[in-house]
A protein has these predicted regions:
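Non-globular, low-confidence helical/coil segments that flank catalytic cores
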Residues: 1-170
Length: 170
């Protein structure tokens, strides 16, 4: 019917796991892209959510952790590990509706992503871009969004330390 055709191309973007280090899951149909950070609690939350969404294939897993204690055990066709990238290098990838760019800094990384005409950004570690970066959506974490201009924020917490100070969305 018409209803299934309409929901067939829906892209879901969700934060799951712990408030301290949430993962981002982008699902469309039976495929997903996972932006991973955190430990075993977040990994289990990702696996549960992928199962709930009926995902059969993780096309890309981007591990945003700067100092992973253990490898991320989520199966994926393709992986990018931020910690393994050289400082000041960029990796780009595309999967279905998702175009992403991962920029590695000395102490962290910036992940910019375009999905369905909307720009998303998430940070890991300590990142201070020299010039402002604009996005419609900040996918929030504990990482302070210095010099990031965003309209809306997807977050698991309203109590990140950076929110209390001067973090008014633009």
């Amino acid at each position: 019917g018409l209803e299934t055709a309409l929901s067939w191309n829906v892209v879901n973007i969700e934060l799951v796991g712990t408030r301290a280090s949430p993962a981002v899951i982008i699902t469309q149909r039976e495929k997903a892209v996972v932006l991973f950070r955190g430990g075993s609690t977040t990994r289990r939350a990702v696996e549960n959510q992928l199962e709930k969404r009926g995902v059969k294939t993780v096309e890309l897993l981007v591990d945003l952790r700067m100092q992973p204690e253990e490898p991320c055990r989520i199966e994926a066709q393709k992986r990018i590990n931020a910690a393994a990238l050289a400082e000041n290098t960029t990796r780009r990838a595309s999967c279905g509706e998702v175009d992403l760019e991962l920029f590695r800094t000395r102490q962290g990384c910036i992940l910019r992503m375009r999905v369905g005409g909307q720009r998303f950004i998430t940070l890991s570690g300590t990142v201070r871009p020299a010039k402002p970066i604009r996005a419609e959506w900040l996918l929030a974490s504990m990482a302070r969004p210095d010099n990031i201009q965003y309209t809306d924020c997807l977050t698991l917490s309203s109590k990140y330390r950076w929110m209390e100070e001067d973090a008014e969305p633009v």
